[in-house]
Amino acid sequence: MDIKNLQSQVDKWINNHGVRYFNELTNMAQLTEEVGEVARIISRRYGEQSEKESDKNLDLGEELADVMFVVLCLANQTGVDLQKSFDSKMALKTKRD
């Protein structure tokens, strides 16, 4: 599934489940929280901190999906076509790197 379809899927889910988009600042705070959860798993599972027993059942993939969901929400709210932006960024990185 491409990014444009993911953006559409998130928008449909929000509109069909009786929820709404939080404002952009709230979603930015949500994104920070979700990235923190990813960081906790990585730092404890792959870094120098020991992984607590309560952290062993945390799913990195689910937490990354939470990050992606909020990023898609922010893109939808601000009118960003992430597919176009991602393709442009990859072309730039390919040329530059």
In which residue ranges do the predicted regions lie?
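Flexible "arm" and connector segments at domain edges
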Residues: 1-64, 68-97
